[in-house]
Amino acid sequence: MELNGIRRRLATAKEAERHRLLLELIRAAAAEALDRPGPLPLDPGRAFGAQGVRGRAAGRLRERLSEATGLPLPATVVFDYPTPGALAGRLCALLLDEPAGPGGANGQMEAEEPIAIVGMGCRLPGDVRSPEGLWRLVHNGTDAISEFPEDRGWTVQQHPDPDHLGTTVTRHAGFLYDAPDFDAGFFAISPGEAVTIDPQHRLLLETTWKAVEDARIDPTSLRGSRTGVFVGLMYSEYGARIRRVPPGAEGYRVVGSMPSVASGRLAYTFGFEGPAVTVDTACSSSLVAMHLAAQSLRKGECTLAVAGGATVMATPWGYIEFSRQRGLAPDGRCRSFSADAAGSSWSEGVGVLLLERLSDARRHGHRVLAVVRGSAVNQDGASNGLTAPNGPAQQRVIRQALAHAGLTTAEVDAVDAHGAGTRLGDPIEAQALLATYGQGRPAGRPLWLGSLKSNIGHTQAAAGAAGVIKMVMAMRHGVLPRSLHITEPTPHVDWTSGAVELLTEARDWPADGRPRRAAVSSFGVGGTNAHIILEQAAPEPERPHAPEADGEPRPLPWPVSGHGAAGLRAQARRLADFLRAGPAAPDADLAYSLATTRATLTDRAVVVAADRAEAIARLTALAEGDQGPRVARATAVPRDRLAFVFPGQGSQWPGMAAELMSCYPVFRESIKECGRSLAPHTDWSLAKVLRGESGAPTLDRVDVVQPALFAVMVSLAALWRSFGVEPSAVAGHSQGEIAAARVAGALSLEDAARVVALRSRALRVLSGRGGMVSVAAPAGQVLRTLERWGGAVSVAAVNGPRSLVISGDPGALGEALAAFEAEGIRARRIPVDYASHSAQVEEIRDTLLTELSGIRPRPATVPFYSTVSGEPLDTTALDTGYWVRNLRDTVQFDRTVRRLLADGHTTFLEMSPHPVLTPGIQETAEEAGADEVLTVESLRRNEGGPARLLTAVAEAHVHGVAVDWSPAFAPHRSPARRPAVLRLSSGAATGLRTRPRPPPMFTTAGLDGIDHPLLGAAIPLADGGGGTLFTGTLSLATHPWLADHAVADVLVVPGTALVEAALRAGAECTGRAMLEELVLQAPLILPEQGTVRIQLSVGGPDGTGRRALILSSRPEDAGADEPWTRHAEGTLAPGGGHPRQDPGPWPPTGAREIDLDDCYRQLAKTGLHYGPAFQGLKRLWRLADDLCLEAELPDSAGESGRYGLHPALFDAALHAAALAGPSGAEPLTRLPFSWSGVALYTAGATRLRARLSFTGPQSLTLTAMDPLGHPVLSVGTLGMRPVTAEALHRAAGTAGTALLRLEWRRQAPEHPAGPDLTGWAWVGAGAPPAQPPDGRPYRDLAALRAELDAGAAVPPVIVLAEPATPEGTDPFTAARAALHRTLAAIQDWAAEERLAGTRLVVLTQGAVAATPGALPDPALAAVWGLVRSAQAEYPDRIGLVDTDDPGRSRAAVAAAVHAGEAQAAVRDGALLVPRLARVTATDGPGGPAWPADGTVLVTGGLGTLGRLVVRHLVTTHGARRLVILSRSGGDSAEVREFVGELLAQGANVQVVKGDAADPAVLERVLDGIPQEHPLAAVAHLAGALDDGVLAAQTPQRLDRVLRPKAEAAWQLHRLTARARVPLLAFSSLSGVLGPAGQAGYAAANAFVDALVQRRRGTGLPGVSMGWGMWATRSGLTGALSDTDARLIARTGVRPLTDEEGLALFDQARATGEPVVFPLGLDITALNSGAPDGIPPLLRGLTARTPARRAGAAEAPEPAGEDLAARLAATPEAERDALLLGVVRGHIAAVLGYDDPRAVAERRPFSDIGFDSLRALQLRNRLGAATGRRLPATLVFDHPNPAALSRYLRTLLLPDPAPAPTAPDGQPGPDQADQVIERLNSASLEEVLDFIDHQLGE
């Protein structure tokens, strides 16, 4: 572009467009300068150097810009204007001949104008982190003095003699223990540089940020402002303490601790351009800095000023020096002005104040905290000594400050004195105050005197600023806090010489009709004195109350941001905590302040929430890494090329603008304007149409829908613009071009309204004579097919690479449709009855030319891209003829999008009430290979309110679009009130603070600090051999990323960490070393709690320079005699080897890529559990027997710069070997055990390219380089060795069996406000009263169905309330009746199609014992068992709630429905959820001894388990008399053999045939037990199964299962109660887990558990044992298939061996628990399972770590529309494979296969283990995955996986193209409505019964 052309474009463009044009020029020139393709994506606000444009590249950039602009730019231009934004501003000024900005003050300043304090920040002793924290400390009278820090390596000893050399008289003062911690990444400071930065500088950076935010100013908004910096510092010894310069730190050490750089660093980091001064006047530094800042402001040198000071002591020399001078108090406390004052206390702290001229603060609306009325600074001069204070000088500085303020002494109420607590200094200061402020005061109004130093000690350079903050807070609270430690006033002062009194108690500080005033003094040890006078700020005007919400609360945006994902999560957590603390301000004010005063950083999120509770819940989820609904989250990239796109028809829906019209004035006014412009051409009201008012025409008329859509689209664009989002281009599809032209300024509103109204009216002539069809195929293929119909069918629109619309004659279209279907091309009709964009339009051409004549197009203010031509268009050509062509010609939308992409537009915002163009844009962008393309939809169908719009704005914002959030608060404004800017929590300034290491001030005494995360220190050995001992500690607290490395559920420190430590030790000893050999001897196990201490011993060199090494560990809390565990031995050799050069092409030619989808779930199945920190493997290729890979260090692994190679990244490179080992290798869990020839060439890599070459089944070599091909690491040989879970569990001490009990744990509701009860149905005799709108009561479901038949609305929730069992009722009879009722009700609910989307909640009272001492109702407990099983068959559709208060049942259900748990109890209003927890077990025989002469009655004792238990009673417990009651009797040979075996053991065994549930039989058996051998115990093992899906269950089938288990238990309890003997009942885990298909069995066992619990509650002995699975197959488990066994194993419950089961039987009796659940646990499976594979009850048993790891093999596919969108975005040739993978994954999960590839795609379901239950489970899973309601006949209709996947494809993508734009046609129904599901006349029971017989055998 030539110079005059640039100038012309700039002269006519708006300011934002000018800036954008010049940024594009700079980005293109930068790309040329760096020899890179395309414009360089430079961030306008970041320095060129930080973005790679430095050195020669900066010079080339200047040359390119000079050539492009014709400007003679100086060689220093990139340094003078160091960011792209600044340089663009400079170029704009030069090109438009604008004068340079002012360099000095703006106008005359008032020489004595007061200075406002508008912001404050501090960090002080006592863990004070804010001004509020300081106020709490002084108001509470807290003493913040504590002991010396232990981590600074201070070896100085305490000695009471002040003359004892080298010692200190005290080891107490006020410290900032975490002073070294720093969020370096937040300030874009590298780890290497951060190590060198003095902690004082770090604290100033963080505290300045907080002070600016405290002023309600976005810190980033001050970049380039004339803000001054005035900070006080007095120490600079930190840099000298860094004896070893860490890697990456050379060149920073000097400036890192120079005091002068502290102010410069602040200015540089924040972009301040006012004066920057560092002040060192010792203890008065910060007050002098404040005085200088005020002067600079008054002179106009700056507009804002940062003033303050900081002190952190790197060495203890100050204590030694002042001990010699007798200036320190022995106890470290300043006793200011007290008779027993004994010296000062050297403390630490930082205080920062933000100052502004008072007039400016008021003009800018900044809150004024206090006013600086006057200040003065002077010097002692030639006083009594260099360091001695001088009273007259102090009097002079006070009088100068008073004169400067224009005040008398009596007008100042209080002074926070220097008050250091010295015997000399305090009396001198007190006399000076008496001689000044003590004179001329009214009676009864003394000067009140105190000192902050009495609380926190002397914070030295920060003391004055801290005192100011204290007094400002005291003014604001109206209280003068007391000074501590004053026993009585010092006698060295004549207190009668003036009216001054000490603040020995806190005092109210009334204003008395005038502002409160106070002064602060600071005196430097060198004689520089400072005094500042503060005045209370004028009260802020009272604001009107927030307007009351008129109905539903309006949503608000809550934006947060951070540097990095961890920083963002930390910010979300802080904000959630702040809101949870309950600030009283309105939510709108809080959100407004957050949106307008906080910096917007790169990692962003926005929570859209209607109330505070919702905001807290979503922020909490965000902090935990979850992204729920109405939460946008992304990492921003620059997005200044943004296009507004406007669709044709198809996006409309009734009510699409109503909510926005009521909320946003901008939108409402735009609609009104459109309505006025349309009125002359229509006979209907736009507003009434949009609101759907009675009498208004509907949207099915083309002459209504097109003008209405036009108005909505234009108004949406106006609304987006009000949010500060301006388009750099516009494009419209068909009639959408009319709206685009209006928004671009190319048509007046009147002309645009005329075009859309008259053209749509003309279209009605064509109705009934045409049609349109969407086709999913490339344009060329479609055109070839259409050739046979000539002009009868035309291509109407090309929407994407494989998405077209054709139009024409109805008959020809029908033939074309059939032809496409015959070719296998998906095509479908669009419901319109005319053919726009076809020859039919010619019939209305003349009409249009006539009616649209007079249109006056004009030049656009925004570039207009025509979809008629597919190119940018001069909009003066948008005449009448253009709008006819727009209707007649093919819509070239695909071409237009490609041109927009080519021109650099990466963001597309769709201005429509429902997204129509977005899918096509995404498809085109993907095919075009465009990166970072963002598409945002404004609204969605039936989501047309502020929540949806704000979510759309949030999506744009988080991805990098600049947004002004002010319009978001329009619904929260009233004429009298706008949202206020509030002061938010000061803790939310920075993200994650970590400790840059190793500042040697924090190393252990006597050791050299090692800058390594694993090896903290080293000490040379004194044996003369040249050896070194390295030490370090490991724990999850210090190395949290190790929690993500678990093998078989045991935390194992990866071998790569040991190698890394060995390499670093070698480098420390020899400068550069190769690890010649390392053999791992034992795994290094990391405990969940506590610390492991490691030692790495490196011997001296031998004759060849080699050194032996040994690595050992033991727990840190181990006793002195506890041995160390040796983990590795090896050899270090000198030198690092020579890396192989010439890496060659990448990936290597011929390499075949391996799909890594789900790879970490696959590894988890082998026992290798890698959490996020270790999930670094990104791509993998196979080349013959070699593997090539790319790996990247995840953010969660922490810093990389201090490692040679981060162990997590090193380990990730080895994951390839586990995933794709050499051919023939067995699939075992292998870990590295030997290394040889390991050399490191480059330190700190975060990305690797590596090649693994297998040299055997268990050995390999590795070479790794960085992405530029530079060598990083090589491994000569790595040996792998299989490891077993048992071995690791032995090492870690974890168990494989467990005794569990059911606990009820309190859980906070996810939505504390509870759900809306509107429309709920309350069914049954136990239902609480319900009145509309909170639901309606129904006698039963039949009554509800009758209302539905009459047209009533379908309820969202049905509550089925089961009545409580009446007192005195037989519990089994009650249970049977309740179960029959519940079964019938659930079956009715499931069979009613109209209730398919309704949730069923079964409500009981007292069914579960949820609190200690409670006794459950066995009848209702049985109902819980049945419903638990039903939940497994109808996942996420049925809930269980138990309450203790019928009157609060509705509240209980409301709380539980949103609790996120399928089962819940509500007790005293608290929500409780069930979890299984471990019970302490005892070894050996447990419980009371079995009486040798007593009789044991056993039911079910002849089954497999029964015989096992009976034999155990005889052989282990010595039982000698047994009666076995069996329904089958003892006639079989097998039973006779068993009895004979027992007889041989000396037992007397009687087998009785009979039914234990028959009371007559049972009474007869009991009566037959002889008195000399009375009944001693009852063991109830009997049971029966009758499995089947719930729909096929009947009351009779239930009864068959209930009788032998539940009814028999009731009779046994009833008839043995008087005997008071133990009842040992065998129940099943199914009673609480509720497996699908076992409703009756689950109910029976739940009844038994509750019955025994009630029995125990009445004082009778007994225990119910709810067994998991036994390995020995019994009558209850013998029918289990292999599939059943796999599925059970997937839950983490493994079969018990006989020995384990019998041991648990004994232990269960000894626990004292009434109900226990003995089972075997496969901890690996338990922790590996996906959430839907592990029942919620068992999730509490999973190991704590790795909490974030990948789960077991499931089908981790996106659900619903996400899957459909993913399918649409997948190339046509890959879609079948994608869906088949989803289907096979879910089938594998249902059948319990670890690998989905085990599912053959064409094998019939009947051959792979499907029965009716598994058919139902697969239907449920696929229904959830697709978001569609699938028929129960799914498996029958589609008999193998391949057929099923084909069916799902047609369901998800009936037309795989994006939702077609019917350019001027009628609206198309939603895609979901297009799906025609198969209808079947059979009942569900008949279908399932058929599947059982056909597929289940």
Curated annotation (Swiss-Prot):
Pathway annotation from the record: Antibiotic biosynthesis; Polyketide biosynthesis
Protein's UniProt keywords contain Magnesium: no
Domain of life: Bacteria
Keywords of this entry: Acyltransferase, Antibiotic biosynthesis, Multifunctional enzyme, Phosphopantetheine, Phosphoprotein, Transferase
Biased composition (Basic and acidic residues): 540-553
Enzyme Commission code: 2.3.1.290
Domain Malonyl-CoA:ACP transacylase (MAT): 644-962
GO biological process terms on file: antibiotic biosynthetic process; fatty acid biosynthetic process; secondary metabolite biosynthetic process
Transmembrane regions listed in the UniProt entry: none
Enzyme class per UniProt: transferase
Location of the active site: 283, 418, 458, 1045, 1211
Domain Ketoreductase (KR) intervals: 1494-1671
Region of interest (N-terminal hotdog fold), residue spans: 1012-1139
Catalytic activity from the UniProt record: 4-nitrobenzoyl-CoA + 6 (S)-methylmalonyl-CoA + malonyl-CoA + 6 NADPH + 12 H(+) = demethyldeoxyspectinabilin + 7 CO2 + 6 NADP(+) + 8 CoA + 5 H2O
InterPro entries the record matches: Ac_transferase_dom_sf (IPR001227), ACP-like_sf (IPR036736), Acyl_transferase_dom (IPR014043), Acyl_Trfase/lysoPLipase (IPR016035), Ketoacyl_synth_AS (IPR018201), Ketoacyl_synth_C (IPR014031), Ketoacyl_synth_N (IPR014030), Malonyl_transacylase_ACP-bd (IPR016036)
Ranges of compositional bias, category Low complexity: 1862-1871
GO molecular function: 3-oxoacyl-[acyl-carrier-protein] synthase activity; fatty acid synthase activity; phosphopantetheine binding
SUPFAM superfamilies hit by this protein: ACP-like, FabD/lysophospholipase-like, NAD(P)-binding Rossmann-fold domains, Probable ACP-binding domain of malonyl-CoA ACP transacylase, Thiolase-like
Segments of this protein annotated with the region C-terminal hotdog fold: 1151-1289
Cofactor(s) the record lists: pantetheine 4'-phosphate
Subunit annotation: The spectinabilin polyketide synthase complex is composed of 4 proteins, NorA, NorA', NorB and NorC. The complex comprises 6 modules with a total of 28 catalytic domains catalyzing 7 chain elongations. NorA comprises one module, NorA' two modules, NorB one module and NorC two modules.
The protein's name in its UniProt record: Spectinabilin polyketide synthase system protein NorA
The organism of origin for this protein: Streptomyces orinoci
